Each structure stands twice: as structure tokens, then as C-alpha cells.
């Protein structure tokens, strides 16, 4: 029997969620809206901090720095708190801006580490030192990147910055580890035939996953040699992949698209065995020589189709992992947090364990 309460329509007086993002280890997340921003613990979901601006409070982009008092803010919404081309590093202990950086065009994404501030513009990625007067360390040109696609890993041994290349379908992978940053080591991965839509780097920094605007294939390369490790099929129809995320131990990959289906793939073996309880699905003709790529594709070992209502059509979900068996989805239009758990019975299934609405 289904004992879950139905999800209500978003009430008109609730602040519209303009963006949502997890911190580096996904133990916290932040949401921003027309009047400020909030920070929550991921699991259990608990409000940790709420900042409401009395006037012109719209925040369109937010990025956390681990569990510190610093968050990166960019204005957005109907009445932006800051210009869309200006980055504010907000110090919530002092409740005021700590650093302000201005650029020549709108900021599309911001990524933080303890030593770096990365700003993504339409055709450029800029890397600054995270200090009181940030020094520009490097800048890289990209193909048109209107979605602000970029990913930064913060592993102590292997730190990488990934973003679209200068040619369609390519990924630029920059080694930003403190030991290598001055050498400006850049690798090019020819990942797809169409534009890069979504990126994710594993927690170990050893793997990078990517989806193109076609949205049918997810490819995973290793960061050391840029060689292809996995080719995963999401589906046959075109789709916009909104979020990709590796599990904390790198053993699984979660993928969410605008088809409202959450897929999970097993990455523990490059050639999953059919007898494995957690094996990905393979096409029956996959072993036949010279078969087209479709028949040799690896499919998710478990998936969940998420019911939607009219007010949540084209909603954009953001993925995070609470642990190696639990996935959290942040929904912007619905303004809710959802938790899904991998459960093994006769076969693996995804179970929707709970949901909560973001506070007003």
C-alpha cells in the first residue's frame, strides 16, 4: 500500500527556486530564489541557514565551499541582488560580501575549491586564486557554452577542471592540482559528436562522465589517459540530461533527464557478468560480432520513472548521493527534496523513501 502523501502543487506564495546545488561532498545543498538563499543538510534534510534580503533579493546562481561560511552568489530573477555579470563571495558569518569580481558578460556557472574560484562565461572559463584579492591564474576559451557546463573535482591527489572544448563534442580537462597547476596541463577528450550537455567527475578524480545534447549515450573516460572506459545507453529517444553524479565510492553512476526517468548504472566492472545481481542490462545481440553500437550498449541495472504533474513539466532535477545506496534529487519547479534508495530483493529496485518541501 502506498502511504506517501501526494505532492501538492507549488503554492503561489512560495519563493520560486531559481537554482540548487550540492556542496563538494554532497553532505549539504543550497537553493536560491527571488528573495535570497537557504542552506540545508542533505540527509536528513534540515535547514542550516537562511538568508533573506529585504529588497532586490534575487539570487540566480549559488555555489557552496564545503561546509564553510562562504558561498558564491550571482544575481538573478525579477529583481537581482547583484548584476548578472558580478560574482559575490558571501561571508555569512559577517553577513556581507567578502569578495566581488566583475566580468564583461553574464556569469553562467561558478565552481569553488579551498584555493580556486572558477567562473564560467559563454565562451570562456576563468580560474582565480581564492584569496582576498583574487589573482587571475588562467583562462580558457570554449565553444558556445550557454548552459555553463563545467565540473571541478577537489580530490587532494587529483584535482581536475572539466569544461567543453573549442570544438563541438570535445572536453577540455585541466589538471588544477597544486603540484601541477603552474604547468597548465590540458588534455582533450573527443567524447561526442554533438555539444556537451552535462559533466561529472568521480570523487576519486579518476573518471569523468559526459552526456551530449542528444542525450542517448553517457560516456565515461579515465582522467589519466583520457581513454574510454564505459559507454552507457540512457535510451533511444533524444533527451536533455539534467544531472549526472557518481556515487561516493565511484561504483555507480546516476543519470537524470527531462524524460523524468532516474537511471543507475553499475561501474564495478568494465565487463559486467550476467550472473551478477547488480549487472547492467546488455542487449541479447551484444555478443554478435560487427553488430551496430546500439546492440552493444550497456543499459542501467535499475531505473525509476518519476511521476509529474502539470506544474512540474520540464522540471530540472539536480542529483546527489547521501551514501552509496541513497540518491537525493533537488527539484527546482516543484521546490522539493526527494530521496530514493537502492533495495535488493529478488532484483535491485529504486524505492522513493521520502520527500520534503524547501522552507519558505
Curated annotation (Swiss-Prot):
Highest rank taxon of the organism: Eukaryota
Alphabetized SMART domains for the sequence: WD40
Organism: Pichia angusta (Yeast)
PANTHER family cross-referenced by the UniProt entry: WD-REPEAT PROTEIN INTERACTING WITH PHOSPHOINOSIDES WIPI -RELATED (PTHR11227)
Gene Ontology biological process: protein transport
The protein's name in its UniProt record: SVP1-like protein 2
Compartments (UniProt record): Vacuole membrane; Cytoplasmic vesicle membrane
InterPro entries the record matches: PROPPIN, WD40/YVTN_repeat-like_dom_sf, WD40_repeat_dom_sf, WD40_rpt
Function: Involved in mitochondrial or peroxisomal functions and amino acid signaling pathways.
Keyword annotations: Cytoplasmic vesicle, Membrane, Protein transport, Repeat, Transport, Vacuole, WD repeat
Record-level GO cellular component terms: cytoplasmic vesicle membrane; vacuolar membrane
WD repeats: 12-50, 191-231, 236-275
Family: Belongs to the WD repeat PROPPIN family.
SUPFAM superfamilies in UniProt: WD40 repeat-like (SSF50978)
Record remark on domains: May contain a beta-propeller domain involved in specific binding to phosphatidylinositol 3,5-bisphosphate (PIP2), leading to the association of the protein to the membrane.
Membrane-topology descriptor: Peripheral membrane protein
